[in-house]
């Protein structure tokens, strides 16, 4: 790869930018067609003024490589590398001093063989059997003798004291695993274990609350552009635009009257260009330009928001047994036992197990140099390097093509008269030039010879009418001379003094729009606007590009204790301990703490282009046209006195350029001209001398990654640090799956204005400006960020091991491993290589709270949080007015028993009822006083229900009782008669946010009550649906800043504004202050959530919540009583043949002639002895016909059980079963028996064979249309049809011919066999609102419907309890019948079928309704 030095890179970069700019410039200039080439002029040696620089030439070919620059100064040391891999073992250390002598051993022998066998290479050193003979004097070492017979085993000597530790060698490479030890003896029986493992999981609990939304995911690729949305409504009228650029010239005015002929003047030389006129008024805005070409496809879009979590799947099959876990760490060694007394000599034993390890041998020789360690983490930025030497100047580029005509320079002073030129060839007539300022009249030239007649020039535009001159004296008539030859041009007259400026002309017609000017310098920062009203949260926008990397934070406090290292090599097994009691299985630990923040990710893709810049201000007027052709020579006139200033004539057409005049002498410097267009980028100048230090620069962009520094040396092992405060928040994880949407939160208070955002990303590169003057040298800038990764450096010297991290928290207890075999104790190995980071352990105990950190800058808005828990209950308010009568309450707990009543007469024995499901466990009542014991009477008949007593006074709220065990759900009781209105109940806990009501008139603020005791937290209610937006209330006092609201949707792009005028080009200003923030960059990835705000004051106590949803199913009840013995089953299959019986008595003689036709076989058994059933004689078949018929009948019955046909005799369990067995059957009425008992209770349903739904018909199916309810009360409330209205009834379902309650039992089973239910009802209305109130624009008067588990479904609110209107024809009072069709669909099958309906908009004499109840369908 070619490596370029800095100067060459700069030149290439400059050429690249210039080429790009040139291409852009060429696109921007749309020139007219090229004219024909003019004839060559005959101008001799006239040097024109120096032209403006030409446009940049094409990039030259790459010049030859420059000489190598001087070696730069040494860079700052690189960042510390990561710890290197463990090195090879070091050289052996010196041997330790000898241990003290052991006690005398038993009789000697030749131990050489045992010594030689005592080396165990795997243990890493020489392990000597500790078998000492009697201690003799040390002789010289003899050669090894032949192996002797093994001597008897000596007693184990006392262990020698450990030698001094040798110098620690470097860590050796990991050895291969040793062979498995022999299985150990069985250990002693363990103590009885603790309680067994946790039992099987209970039944599935109720659905949990939605989880908190996951952290925002990493930004995905940019999506393709969506289809165009529908056209939005017209926006509000925009602010008045800036004035437009000048319009095109108007058409010439009518021709004036012809002026008197003047004397024919001699054409003066072209005057110098006039001074720049004042800017004209801007013209109107030009029409919008043509639509640009379609852009290329965008990047892939960010992944969409995660869908709602699906329903919990069924539990999967149990997995196979996992692989055996890794062996645990070795236990700590036990204390050494005391030495025993010597015993008598034993018989020679078998060879003993290997003795205790000897002292570790000296370290080995140094190993070969290890491979380079892995790349270290990027270190901190090094200090800025010193400036390099200037590079060699590049070669001169090729001459560029001729530049465009520059603007006219200032008018020069008049030059001295030139020498007379030779006569030129006759030029083609030029177009008329613009009128130059009048020159002073030149001195009369000598009369020339008469010239030939020239060709007639084109007719000039009519001149303005001159003022009347003074009448001259009449001359004598001369003879007409013949036209002479044209004379030589006279000497050039002196340039006249410029005339005074004329009066300001009238404003001309608007010119054509100018080209866009360059953007002006940024204006001063405007005053901060008032905070706007908070908008509604929009849908989530696409994830923005990642924000700019923040500055490096301060070093964090010490981190938490590190995770456990990877298990070391399996140590030698200790001797088996007694078996401990089995521990109870621990609960799953809490999830571990978040990990540390990861390293910064790679730079993101480039951001999208910035918004189109603001319209520039109008450009300057163009330079004047070139001088026109020379006119015919006139007769010299006398110099007239200057006339008065004429009126300004209409603008003439532009002339074609004249030929160049002779070069004038240099005039004095004119005033500086207007700013010219930017010149091309010059070649880099030579390097200036170092300037003095400037002010501190802004933070630099991230540099390229520098080369990896040499790894630092390993530090010594540090002490275990204290547990640090929690680390910073981890980097955002990948986007989790989106949880189900949380309930809507209430609108937060308006947030305080945020701090000024960071400067946005730089816009696209502008055109290169002209080189500025050398600035003052800047001060040394901040250290830059780390550059991109350089080439890998040479491996550094091996560093010492780093300090081990603090011990991590204990991991989750693993399952008990299989019992390992007892291995021989190994010698201590060298420390193994550092393991990989283990998985996070379970949470340690919480550390002490760290000191509060400084408040961070406001982070970007976090993802929308869940609705918070209800606040502390506020103080009880003042007694409110009595509320509307409550709905019938749940039965209260049993009161204390009363004294026994007198015995009633014996009643008749009732029918045996169905065994009810166990009810919920009631609270225990107080025991009543014992009554006098009466004689047992007969069981009385049930008495009639008594009237409901008057409501009791409201009791004080009780303290929270212990939670009872959840009972099984009881079957619904029969509805009681409607109770009288009770007194207002105690205010309940705060419920969920209801639907947004219509705005009331603001009431006067009440005084806050004192704070009451904190109530028991109610069940979490369902979030209400968002109501329609009320009109704005009066502005409240400013609240404490609420949490940041959710990010709104990215609005649709507005219509493009009109193009502004082109401005004047300014001078290059001094370095400005940092500009105001640029247009927002794309949204960065969401930052971590900001710190929580201060806790708000307790909110007011909310209204009481709705009843909570049913509790989770209770534990499985005790087994029921033993059932009755079953009926006798069908006969079993025939048994195996019995053993042969004893021989029978001899039979009578047989007539063999019957079998004469069989013939006699020569070989084989007698054919009569082995008759098969299918070969039996026809006489045997008489009896088999019944058997065959029975078998066939049984076969048909079994087949019909396996594949029911939906008849009354053979019903299916559900329509889904019928569809599976007979997919080709059509939808229609079939019989099903969900409880699978006797088929006599089967019921007839409609089976939708396309979906498999079982639809049960209502009975009856209609509520007649009439006026069901009259009320003079003006207060509207929902009235239940079955419970309250006279003649109303609860809807029932199933076949009317079935025994009472049979349909309910069958429906209970059908609900259990189904996962989804749906039902439609049609509400026929006359002057009654069913769903949407068109006049009010809300759903306040919508019906309520009651499900079979007494849950009410509404038109709005929590989506799980809302129904939908498929058709709504009851939105206003028309005096005619209309209808609204309502559908409720739910996966909670217990809520269906619908059993009652409550309209609100009824009670008037002209308000009637009726209902068609549709079948309830289960799938």
Curated annotation (Swiss-Prot):
Record InterPro entries: Collagen, Collagen_superfamily, Fib_collagen_C
Pfam families membership: COLFI, Collagen
Propeptide span(s): 26-113
Residue ranges constituting the Fibrillar collagen NC1 domain according to the UniProt record: 1185-1419
ATP-binding as UniProt keyword: no
UniProt main location, coarse: secreted
Composition bias, Pro residues: 89-104, 140-149, 365-374, 1001-1011, 1131-1148
S-S bonds: 1215-1247, 1255-1417, 1325-1370
Biased composition, class Low complexity, residue ranges: 124-135, 150-171, 242-252, 267-282, 335-363, 404-417, 554-563, 638-668, 765-780, 809-846, 1080-1089, 1103-1113
Biological-process GO terms, alphabetical: anterior head development; bone development; cartilage condensation; cartilage development; cartilage development involved in endochondral bone morphogenesis; cellular response to BMP stimulus; cellular response to insulin-like growth factor stimulus; cellular response to mechanical stimulus
UniProt PTM: Contains mostly 4-hydroxyproline. Prolines at the third position of the tripeptide repeating unit (G-X-P) are 4-hydroxylated in some or all of the chains.
Chain positions carrying an annotated carbohydrate: 122, 219, 231, 240, 306, 540, 552, 1320
Annotated positions of the 4-hydroxyproline modification: 591, 600, 603, 606, 840, 846, 852, 1113, 1119, 1134, 1137, 1140, 1143, 1146
Binding site for Ca(2+): 1233, 1235-1236, 1238, 1241
Record key words, sorted: Calcium, Collagen, Disulfide bond, Extracellular matrix, Glycoprotein, Hydroxylation, Metal-binding, Repeat, Secreted, Signal
5-hydroxylysine found at: 122, 219, 231, 240, 306, 540, 552
GO cellular-component term (any): collagen type II trimer
Signal peptide, first to last residue: 1-25
Region called Triple-helical region, residue ranges: 133-1146
Localization annotation: Secreted, Extracellular space, Extracellular matrix
PTM-bearing positions, type 3-hydroxyproline: 602, 839, 1076, 1118, 1133, 1139, 1145
Tissue: Expressed in chondrocytes.
Superkingdom of the source species: Eukaryota
Function recorded in the entry: Type II collagen is specific for cartilaginous tissues. It is essential for the normal embryonic development of the skeleton, for linear growth and for the ability of cartilage to resist compressive forces.
Family in the record: Belongs to the fibrillar collagen family.
Name of this protein: Collagen alpha-1(II) chain
Organism: Rattus norvegicus
């Amino acid at each position: 790869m070619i490596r370029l030095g800095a100067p060459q890179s700069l030149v290439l970069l400059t050429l690249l930018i210039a080429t790009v700019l040139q291409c852009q410039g060429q696109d921007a200039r749309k020139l007219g067609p090229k004219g024909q080439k003019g004839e060559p002029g005959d101008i001799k040696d006239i040097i024109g003024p120096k032209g403006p620089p030409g446009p940049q030439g094409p990039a030259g070919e790459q010049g030859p490589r420059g000489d190598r620059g001087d070696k730069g100064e040494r860079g700052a040391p690189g960042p510390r590398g990561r710890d290197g891999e463990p090195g090879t073992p070091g050289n052996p250390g010196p041997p330790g001093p000898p241990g003290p002598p052991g006690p005398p051993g038993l009789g000697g022998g030749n131990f050489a063989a045992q010594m030689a066998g005592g080396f165990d290479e795997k243990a890493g050193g020489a392990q000597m059997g500790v078998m000492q003979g009697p201690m003799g004097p040390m002789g010289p070492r003899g050669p090894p003798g032949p192996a002797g017979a093994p001597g008897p085993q000596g007693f184990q000597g006392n262990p020698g004291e450990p030698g001094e530790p040798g110098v620690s060698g470097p860590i050796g490479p990991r050895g291969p695993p040793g062979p498995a030890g022999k299985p150990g003896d069985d250990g002693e029986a363990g103590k009885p274990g603790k309680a067994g493992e946790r039992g099987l999981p209970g039944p599935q609990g109720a659905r949990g609350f939605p989880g908190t939304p996951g952290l925002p995911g990493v930004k995905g690729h940019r999506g393709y552009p969506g289809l165009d949305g529908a056209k939005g409504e017209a926006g509000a009228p925009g602010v008045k635009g800036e004035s437009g650029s000048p319009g095109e010239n108007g058409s010439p005015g009518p021709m004036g009257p012809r002026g008197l002929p003047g004397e024919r003047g001699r054409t003066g030389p072209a005057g110098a260009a006039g001074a720049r006129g004042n800017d004209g008024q801007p013209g109107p805005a030009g029409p919008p330009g043509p639509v640009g070409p379609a852009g290329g496809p965008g990047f892939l879009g960010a992944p969409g928001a995660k869908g709602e979590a699906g329903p919990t799947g069924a539990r999967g099959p149990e997995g196979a047994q996992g692989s055996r876990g890794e062996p645990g760490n070795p236990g700590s060694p036990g204390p050494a036992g005391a030495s025993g007394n010597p015993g008598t000599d034993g018989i020679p034993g078998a060879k003993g197990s290997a003795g205790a390890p000897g002292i570790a041998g000296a370290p080995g020789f140094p190993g070969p140099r290890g491979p380079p360690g892995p790349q270290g983490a990027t270190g901190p930025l090094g200090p800025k390097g010193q400036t390099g030497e200037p590079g060699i100047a590049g070669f001169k580029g090729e001459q560029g093509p001729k530049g465009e005509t520059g603007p006219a320079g200032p008018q020069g002073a008049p030059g001295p008269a030139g020498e007379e030129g030779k006569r030129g060839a006759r030029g083609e007539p030029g177009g008329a030039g613009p009128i130059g300022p009048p020159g002073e009249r030149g001195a009369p030239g000598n009369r020339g010879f008469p010239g030939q007649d020239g060709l007639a020039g084109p007719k000039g535009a009519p001149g303005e009418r001159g003022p009347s001159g003074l009448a001259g004296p009449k001359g004598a008539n001369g003879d007409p001379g013949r036209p002479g030859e044209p004379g030589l041009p006279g000497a050039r007259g002196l340039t006249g003094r410029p005339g005074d400026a004329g009066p300001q002309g009238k404003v001309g017609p608007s010119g054509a729009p100018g080209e866009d000017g360059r953007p002006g310098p940024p204006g001063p920062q405007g005053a901060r606007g008032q905070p706007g009203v908070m908008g509604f949260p929009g849908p989530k926008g696409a994830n923005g590009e990642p924000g700019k990397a923040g500055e490096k934070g301060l070093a964090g406090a010490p981190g938490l204790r590190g995770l456990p290292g990877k298990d070391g090599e399996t140590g030698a097994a200790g001797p088996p301990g007694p078996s401990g009691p089995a521990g109870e299985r621990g609960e799953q630990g809490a999830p571990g703490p978040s990990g540390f923040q990861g390293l910064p990710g790679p730079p993101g893709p480039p951001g999208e282009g910035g918004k189109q810049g603001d319209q520039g201000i109008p450009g300057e007027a163009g330079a004047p046209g070139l001088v026109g052709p020379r006119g015919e020579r006139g007769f010299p006139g006398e110099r007239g006195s200057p006339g008065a200033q004429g009126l300004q004539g209409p603008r003439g057409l532009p002339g074609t350029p004249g030929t160049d005049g002779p070069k004038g002498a240099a005039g004095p410097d004119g005033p500086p001209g207007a700013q010219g267009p930017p010149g091309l980028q010059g070649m880099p100048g030579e390097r200036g001398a170092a300037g003095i230090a400037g002010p501190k620069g802004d933070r630099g962009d991230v540099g390229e990654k520098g080369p990896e520094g040499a790894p630092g040396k390993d530090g010594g092992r540090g002490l275990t640090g204290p547990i640090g405060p929690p680390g910073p928040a981890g980097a955002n994880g990948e986007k989790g799956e989106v949880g189900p949407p949380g309930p809507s939160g209430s609108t937060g208070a308006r947030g305080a204005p945020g701090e000024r955002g960071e400067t946005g990303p730089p816009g696209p590169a502008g055109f290169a400006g002209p080189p500025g003057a050398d600035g003052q040298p800047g001060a040394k800038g901040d250290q830059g960020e780390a550059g991109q990764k350089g080439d890998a450096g040479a491996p550094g010297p091996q560093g010492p091991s780093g300090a081990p991290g603090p011990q991590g928290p204990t991991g989750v207890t693993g399952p008990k491993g299989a019992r390992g075999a007892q291995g021989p104790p190994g010698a201590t190995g060298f420390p193994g290589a550092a393991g990989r980071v283990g998985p996070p352990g379970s949470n340690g105990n919480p550390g002490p709270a760290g000191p509060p950190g400084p408040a961070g800058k406001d982070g970007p808005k976090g993802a929308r949080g869940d609705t918070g828990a209800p606040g502390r209950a506020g103080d009880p308010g003042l007694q409110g007015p009595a509320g509307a009568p409550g709905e019938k309450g749940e039965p209260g707990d049993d009161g204390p028993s009363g004294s026994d009543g007198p015995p009633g007469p014996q009643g008749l024995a009732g029918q045996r009822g169905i065994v009810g499901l166990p009810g919920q466990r009631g609270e225990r009542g107080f025991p009543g006083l014992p009554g006098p014991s009466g004689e047992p009477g007969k069981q009385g008949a049930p008495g009639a229900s008594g009237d409901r007593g008057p409501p009791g006074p409201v009791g004080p709220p009780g303290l929270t009782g212990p939670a009872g065990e959840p009972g099984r759900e009881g079957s619904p009781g029969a509805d009681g008669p409607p109770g009288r209105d009770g007194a207002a109940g105690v205010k309940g806990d705060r419920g969920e946010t209801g639907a947004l009501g219509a705005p009331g008139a603001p009431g006067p603020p009440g005084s806050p009550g004192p704070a009451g005791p904190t109530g028991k937290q109610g069940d979490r209610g369902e979030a209400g649906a968002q109501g329609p937006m009320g009109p704005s209330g009066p502005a409240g006092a400013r609240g404490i800043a609420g949490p940041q609201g959710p990010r709104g949707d990215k609005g649709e792009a507005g219509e493009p504004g009109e193009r502004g005028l082109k401005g004047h080009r300014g001078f290059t200003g001094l370095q400005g202050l940092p500009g105001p923030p640029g247009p927002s960059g794309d949204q960065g990835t969401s930052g971590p959530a900001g710190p929580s705000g201060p806790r708000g004051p307790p909110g007011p106590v909310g209204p009481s919540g709705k009843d909570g949803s049913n509790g989770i199913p209770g534990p499985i009840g005790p087994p029921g009583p033993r059932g009755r013995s079953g009926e006798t089953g069908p006969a079993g299959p025939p048994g195996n043949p019995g053993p042969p019986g004893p021989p029978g008595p001899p039979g009578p003689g047989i007539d063999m002639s019957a079998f004469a036709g069989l013939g006699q076989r020569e070989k084989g058994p007698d054919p009569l002895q082995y008759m098969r059933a299918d070969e039996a004689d026809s006489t045997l078949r008489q009896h088999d016909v019944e058997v065959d018929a029975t078998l066939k009948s049984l076969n048909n019955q079994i087949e019909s059980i396996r594949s029911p046909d939906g008849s009354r005799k053979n019903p299916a369990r559900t329509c889904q079963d019928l569809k599976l067995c007979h997919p080709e059957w059509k939808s229609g009425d079939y019989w099903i028996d969900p409880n699978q008992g006797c088929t006599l209770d089967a019921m007839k349903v409609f089976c939708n064979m396309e979906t498999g739904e079982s639809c049960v018909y209502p009975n009856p199916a209609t509520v007649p249309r009439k006026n069901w309810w009259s009320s003079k009360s003006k207060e509207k409330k929902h009235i239940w049809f079955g419970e309250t209205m006279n003649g109303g009834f609860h809807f029932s379902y199933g076949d009317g011919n079935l025994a009472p309650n049979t349909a309910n039992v069958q429906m209970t089973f059908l609900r259990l066999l189904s996962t989804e239910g749906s039902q439609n009802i049609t509400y026929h209305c006359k002057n009654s609102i069913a769903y949407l109130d068109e006049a009010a624009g809300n759903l306040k008067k919508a019906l309520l419907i009651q499900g079979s588990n007494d849950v009410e479904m509404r038109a709005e609110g929590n989506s799980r309890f809302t129904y939908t209107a498929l058709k709504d024809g009851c939105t206003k009072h028309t005096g005619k019948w209309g209808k609204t069709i309502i559908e409720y669909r739910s996966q909670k099958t217990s809520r269906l079928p619908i059993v009652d309906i409550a309209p609100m908009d009824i009670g008037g004499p002209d308000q009637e309704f009726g209902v068609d109840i549709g079948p309830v369908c289960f799938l």
